[in-house]
């Protein structure tokens, strides 16, 4: 490192290293690239990040991320109200949308139940899910949770809460045990959604 004060650059590298998939070395390379491409990438990126910091918010209805209190998916009157797809986080919702197969509504839990991390039902959007099933005319809840231990524990808990109230299904073939939706290709997600099974 040169003798001049690079504290701002080092601070940016440290922040970038906190992003998923970036370690200290990749963050350093990314920051150096941003600096080299200041006008083309760094300045527009900084402007976009500033706008997102001001405008991004969680949809009050489903938990998706957007720039208004109710997201575009919830406002879309062409979507099927009877089907509600439950996912762990926004990345999973976006993965389902990329697959282009599901045309119903979504519900983002905001995580999974976890005894190790002391995350219980009240820490997630499970009470809101139960309320939506009761008030929105939902006929089927599709549990599109990751095939992890915490994901399956959460699915069983939700199934217990909604048992007898609504048809419950889960994604079938194509989602490997231990797999996460955000890492699957669109075809795999499509096949899994079409072959869902009742719980």
From Swiss-Prot:
Cysteines joined through disulfide linkages: none
PROSITE patterns for this protein: TOPRIM
InterPro entries the record matches: DNA_Rcmb_RecR, Rcmb_RecR, TOPRIM_dom, TOPRIM_RecR
UniProt domain Toprim: residue ranges: 82-176
Zinc fingers classed as C4-type: ranges: 59-74
Key words, A-Z: DNA damage, DNA recombination, DNA repair, Metal-binding, Zinc, Zinc-finger
Signal keyword on record: no
UniProt-listed SMART domains: TOPRIM
Biological-process GO terms, alphabetical: DNA recombination; DNA repair
GO MF annotation list: DNA binding; zinc ion binding
Function summary: May play a role in DNA repair. It seems to be involved in an RecBC-independent recombinational process of DNA repair. It may act with RecF and RecO.
NCBIfam families noted in UniProt: recR
PANTHER family named among the record's database cross-references: RECOMBINATION PROTEIN RECR
Family from the record: Belongs to the RecR family.
Protein name in the entry: Recombination protein RecR
Organism: Ruegeria sp. (strain TM1040) (Silicibacter sp.)
Protein encoded by which gene: recR
């Amino acid at each position: 490192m040169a003798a001049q004060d690079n504290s701002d650059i080092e601070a940016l590298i440290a922040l970038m290293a906190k992003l998923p998939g970036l370690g200290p070395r990749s963050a350093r390379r990314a920051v150096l690239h941003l600096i080299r491409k200041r006008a083309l990438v760094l300045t527009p990126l900084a402007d976009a990040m500033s706008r997102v910091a001001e405008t991004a918010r969680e949809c009050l209805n489903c938990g998706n991320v957007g720039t208004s209190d109710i997201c575009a998916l919830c406002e879309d009157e062409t979507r099927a109200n009877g089907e509600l797809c439950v996912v762990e986080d926004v990345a999973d919702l976006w993965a389902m949308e990329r697959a282009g197969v599901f045309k119903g509504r979504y519900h983002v839990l905001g995580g999974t139940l976890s005894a190790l991390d002391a995350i219980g039902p009240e820490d997630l959007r499970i009470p809101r899910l139960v309320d939506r099933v009761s008030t929105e005319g939902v006929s089927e809840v599709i549990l599109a949770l990751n095939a992890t231990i915490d994901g399956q524990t959460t699915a069983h808990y939700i199934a217990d809460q909604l048992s007898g109230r609504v048809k419950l299904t889960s994604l079938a073939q194509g989602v490997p045990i231990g797999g996460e939706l955000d890492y699957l290709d669109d075809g795999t997600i499509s096949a899994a959604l079409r072959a869902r099974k009742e719980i």
